[in-house]
Amino acid sequence: SVGFKAGVKDYRLTYYTPDYETKDTDILAAFRVTPQPGVPAEEAGAAVAAESSTGTWTTVWTDGLTSLDRYKGRCYHIEAVVGEENQYIAYVAYPLDLFEEGSVTNMFTSIVGNVFGFKALRALRLEDLRIPPSYSKTFQGPPHGIQVERDKLNKYGRPLLGCTIKPKLGLSAKNYGRAVYECLRGGLDFTKDDENVNSQPFMRWRDRFLFCAEAIYKAQAETGEIKGHYLNATAGTCEEMIKRAVFARELGVPIVMHDYLTGGFTANTSLAHYCRDNGLLLHIHRAMHAVIDRQKNHGMHFRVLAKALRMSGGDHIHAGTVVGKLEGEREMTLGFVDLLRDDYIEKDRSRGIFFTQDWVSMPGVLPVASGGIHVWHMPALTEIFGDDSVLQFGGGTLGHPWGNAPGAVANRVALEACVQARNEGRDLAREGNEIIPEACNWSPELAAACE
């Protein structure tokens, strides 16, 4: 008689444990599970726990060489999703030992690496993760964080202003630098490389870095403010990426940029470590996020990618705009904006926050609002995002009838007007449509932008 019995067995016998008390050191996950017809919810939830931790489809004799109880993921709670048929939220607890310290890459390989192709599930979405302090403390996190960034830039009490240089592809390095200079001179704090500007035949990275640095220094000299341009260091290899970051540091510029999903978490964490060691700020673009987070029933919610970025490291990250979207979306967006900026975030299902998250003083990340916003949105953006944010107007700056610099002036005037109005106790949501026209009286550039 053999000591174990091979053969396919129900996952729920081992991995569904409704009595389990979660530990402070567990990583907790909330999955939205859509089982195939005929598969019970408990079995589907247990299957997720098994396939993303120790399980395989059958009993193997080597199971006897380890303590399964110590290492297995456990589905400890299942609830039906209100308003959806055959959708469940399955809560899974993973023991800390399953994960390599300081590796977002390993965390994702474990939790979402294999289980999403699982046959018994029609669809699967990771909605949220609770990262325990015992795990988050193994990460450096953002290179600098919000407070250090404000001190470096000497800019307080207002959101920061940015602009993506367009047309994003096709400009020569010199003309690109000229566009950067115009925007910074006009009053923006930052300009930005587009996410797909890396090092193409029409503009190699080194030439762009040089002309942008020249633009930054010229604009700083004229305005007396510290300026920056997000120099995109994303490259085909980690070595090349670091080489570009080193060159940016040698030029003395304040900030570089990375596409963290296309570049990958390993590359991103390497760059974040370099940035902290060398005093560079790190701007993160989320290119490719919609591939992962757009489907409501499959993939990962962006709040998970945002938490992962805070652990891997970045000082800014794009976070949608909220303006003009649906109400529910607004609450969800503000939920993960808080997860990026705050130290301690209470569980709040109405904002999509499934777990209380304690970051224990890991530096925060500035959310970047960008995409289709213009000066009329300024009061709403100032109110919704508050001071700790970067507001990015691409076409909203460069589309100004008089050119880039006046477009930048218009944005800066609108922002300062909104901040002043707010500080005087006015209600931006209600009076926004009066505040901007009032400011137009003092600024022909803003008046032209509003027409």
UniProtKB/Swiss-Prot annotation:
GO BP terms: photorespiration; reductive pentose-phosphate cycle
Post-translational modifications reported in the UniProt record: The disulfide bond which can form in the large chain dimeric partners within the hexadecamer appears to be associated with oxidative stress and protein turnover.
Chain positions recorded as substrate binding sites: N114, T164, K168, R286, H318, S370
Chain positions with N6-carboxylysine modification: K192
Residues annotated as binding Mg(2+): K192, D194, E195
CC annotations in GO: chloroplast
Active site: K166, H285
Transition state stabilizer (site feature) positions: K325
The protein's assembly and partners: Heterohexadecamer of 8 large chains and 8 small chains; disulfide-linked. The disulfide link is formed within the large subunit homodimers.
Function: RuBisCO catalyzes two reactions: the carboxylation of D-ribulose 1,5-bisphosphate, the primary event in carbon dioxide fixation, as well as the oxidative fragmentation of the pentose substrate in the photorespiration process. Both reactions occur simultaneously and in competition at the same active site.
Name used for this protein in its record: Ribulose bisphosphate carboxylase large chain
Organism lineage: Eukaryota, Viridiplantae, Streptophyta, Embryophyta, Tracheophyta
